[in-house]
């Protein structure tokens, strides 16, 4: 029986070749002439034009097998499609691809590529250097549009302080970099979203406090007075008989021209808009007071200031209350004692002092101390630059004395820095406990002999000249006693406000009950420095 298959010429089994065998290159394409020469077909069978069969661009090169090179399985082997002497094309090509992706087999970069890489690296470094210089110049030109004598005198002191904090910021930068390598990408995204949410919440908090300040101090319009028109009401009541169903006159007729209410100030929104906003914290050994969120405002029109406290109850309830009433205040200690606060006294790290007896609304824990000390942690730098441009303040000779005081403390701190390098934590914690033992009265004040004894016990000896100079600066009131917290901050130094803000934030996270104290075991549970660069390096 003869079988006729339309469209495909039938060939004998002996003429069929194995399926996987490549004898022609991959780019070879079929033509109708080659097909007709090799296989003649009857005239009734239409010709197949295989020249239009072309690979698509998205197909892999090894997935296309031309029909001329594709061999059907040999009839002599019924166990497999591949003869023992042949290798499957796909396996051969995949092995070849695996060899190509091994990094060790990659060719070395050419000199041209190396040159381009060095040029690109140099351009990036130069661009970043110029960018940093531009930012520094802009900041310097904005802040020091008119260089004050304070900046000219204590330039050396400021440079020493920057050199002292450079190591800390460098370590922090390394820790952040190491943290970026150690954390997962999901953790990075989650941390970035959390940081953005915290920034938005902080800005919203400041806006709420600023609005409350405006509401409290703006001149309100006179609405009504419960005692207004009292004489008119009495006259009309003489002629009209009392009626229980009739609405009283004080509710029926309200006029404003005879009111007795008078506004105490003429403040307007435009006047109050010229203000400097800053964040502050209380310098105290009481943990609850130290964690209070304070936001202050200094008004340039009358050199007055006010401080508000932001309180949060739970997640949704908040309250803004005045902590220091709006008034004109003066320094209560230091070289500027008795001098009125002005714009130059407000900067990050500045200390504002108030008499606790002048503010009856303060908490009892703060009233126990004679002075209330507030440290400025953050400030609106844009508003400060704008207000400094508008106002021309004259510096006095006190700036020179304050600069010399900072240089005295800086010299003592440099001497003690080497001794505190390897055992700083133990010395600081031990020194604090020792001061508490010496403080029999519990007010935090110690005399000169106690401080000398403490320095000797912890092997922190300083020269007699430096100690006397520091004592004269700290004992400004002349009563022979100094707060041991101020003494420790003066001779040893303290953390900058940027880093201390993170410490306060971590403390408030652990102190969820707002008790003002955290057990050391809770700190050990949460504190982990294994990802810090110095810990990793050993």
UniProtKB/Swiss-Prot annotation:
Pfam (any one): PH_CAYP2
Positions that bind Ca(2+) 2: 477, 479, 481, 486
Region (Disordered) location: 134-154
Cross-referenced Gene3D superfamilies: EF-hand
Binding site for Ca(2+) 1: 439, 443, 450
Record-listed Ca(2+) 3 binding positions: 511, 513, 515, 517, 522
Composition bias, Polar residues: 134-146
UniProt entry keywords in alphabetical sequence: Calcium, Metal-binding, Repeat
Location of the EF-hand domain: 426-461, 462-497, 498-533
Expressing tissues: Abundantly expressed in many tissues. Expressed in brain, colon, heart, kidney, liver, lung, liver, pancreas, placenta, skeletal muscle, testis and thymus. Highest expression in colon, testis, lung, placenta and brain.
Single GO MF descriptor: calcium ion binding
SUPFAM superfamilies: EF-hand
PANTHER family named in the record: CALCYPHOSIN (PTHR34524), CALCYPHOSIN-2 (PTHR34524:SF3)
Name this polypeptide is given: Calcyphosin-2
Organism, as annotated: Homo sapiens (Human)
Species lineage: Eukaryota, Metazoa, Chordata, Craniata, Vertebrata
């Amino acid at each position: 029986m003869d079988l006729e298959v339309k469209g495909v010429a039938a060939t004998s089994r002996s003429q069929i070749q194995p399926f996987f065998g490549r004898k022609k290159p991959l780019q070879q394409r079929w033509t109708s002439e080659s097909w007709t020469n090799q296989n003649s077909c009857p005239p009734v069978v239409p010709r197949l034009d295989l020249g239009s069969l072309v690979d698509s661009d998205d197909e892999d090169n090894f997935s296309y097998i031309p029909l001329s090179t594709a061999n059907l399985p040999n009839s002599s082997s019924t166990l497999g499609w591949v003869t023992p002497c042949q290798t499957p094309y796909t396996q051969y090509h995949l092995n070849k691809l695996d060899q190509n992706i091994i990094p060790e087999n990659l060719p070395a970069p050419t000199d041209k590529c190396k040159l381009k890489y060095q040029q690109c690296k140099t351009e990036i470094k130069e661009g970043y250097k110029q960018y940093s210089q531009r930012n520094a110049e802009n900041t310097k030109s904005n802040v020091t549009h008119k260089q004050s004598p304070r900046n000219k005198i204590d330039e050396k002191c400021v440079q020493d302080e920057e050199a002292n904090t450079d190591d800390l910021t460098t370590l922090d930068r390394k820790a952040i970099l190491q943290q970026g390598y150690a954390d997962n990408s999901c953790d990075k995204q989650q941390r970035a979203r959390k940081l953005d949410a915290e920034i938005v919440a902080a800005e919203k908090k400041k806006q709420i406090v600023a609005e409350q300040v405006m509401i409290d101090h703006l001149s309100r319009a006179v609405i009504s007075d419960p005692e207004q028109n009292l004489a008119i009401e009495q006259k009309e009541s003489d002629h009209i008989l009392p009626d229980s169903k009739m609405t009283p006159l004080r509710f029926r007729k309200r006029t404003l021209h005879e009111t007795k209410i008078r506004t105490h100030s003429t403040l307007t929104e435009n006047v109050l808009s010229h203000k400097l906003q800053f964040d502050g914290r209380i310098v105290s050994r009481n943990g609850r007071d130290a964690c209070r969120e304070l936001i202050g405002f200094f008004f340039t029109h009358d050199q007055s200031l006010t401080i508000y406290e932001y309180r949060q109850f739970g997640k949704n309830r908040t309250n803004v209350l005045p902590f220091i009433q709006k008034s004109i205040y003066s320094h209560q200690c230091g070289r500027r004692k008795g001098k009125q606060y002005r714009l130059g006294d407000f900067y990050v790290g500045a200390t504002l002092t108030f008499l606790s007896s002048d503010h009856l609304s303060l908490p009892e824990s703060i009233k126990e101390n004679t002075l209330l000390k507030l440290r400025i942690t953050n400030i609106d730098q844009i508003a400060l630059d704008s207000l400094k441009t508008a106002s021309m303040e004259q510096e006095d000779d006190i700036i020179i004395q304050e600069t010399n005081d900072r240089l005295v403390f800086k010299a003592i701190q440099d001497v003690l820095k080497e001794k505190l390098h390897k055992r700083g934590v133990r010395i600081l914690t031990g020194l604090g406990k020792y001061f508490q033992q010496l403080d029999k009265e519990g007010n935090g004040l110690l005399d000169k002999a106690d401080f000398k004894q403490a320095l000797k016990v912890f092997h922190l000896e300083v020269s007699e000249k430096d100690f006397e100079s520091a004592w004269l600066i700290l004992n400004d009131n002349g009563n022979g006693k100094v707060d041991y917290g101020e003494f420790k901050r003066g001779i040893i130094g303290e953390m900058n406000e940027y880093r201390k803000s993170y410490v306060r934030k971590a403390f408030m996270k652990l102190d969820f009950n707002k008790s003002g104290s955290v057990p050391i075991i809770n700190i050990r549970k949460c504190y982990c420095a294994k990802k810090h660069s110095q810990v990793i390096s050993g």
